[in-house]
Amino acid sequence: LTSAQGLSASTAGALLTVSVAAAVASGIVLGLLTGRYPMRRSWLVLSIMVASATMWAIVLALPGPAPLWLLVLLVVVISVGGPGSVIGFDLARTFNPSANLGTAQGMVNIGGFLASLLVIAAIGWILDAMGGYTFESFRVALLVQFPVWIVAIIGVLATRRKTRKVLAADGIHPHTMREV
């Protein structure tokens, strides 16, 4: 925020505070939504990923630093991702037999953290290879997130399809979005 976007340290710090507040507030909202609409949890996850990717695409497509209002919006949207990732634990708990629950929870945990760490490392490697913390270096480095989102979206869609087949075999037929 300070290097590529040219923000002061105090403004960057304020954005981090906004991030924490957005994560707390969205955690409460997502908890209510997943409790009220349990068969729509995958849509919540997909919406969060698409919103994050869209915000990053907008910010990274700009020819120069983003206006502060757009950075605030970016921070709010990407801050929903933390609480949103917890939905994966809820899905693993709901749709796996108790004998496999530990493995399922472990896969959700390690998958999310491993993807995050690999993205962070790749961003660092790209920044180093490009010679520093310029706006253009950050723009290129932050593009590494997009393939991860694509893989994650494909994974959510594939597991949702399998889960719906299992539910259908048990006589449970979730309504499509058109039917809701």
Task: Give residue spans per PLM region.
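Intracellular juxtamembrane helix-capping segments at the cytosolic ends
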Residues: P83-P97
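A late C-terminal transmembrane helix in Major Facilitator Superfamily
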Residues: S98-G131
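Helix-to-loop junctions at the C-terminal end of transmembrane segments
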Residues: S26-R40
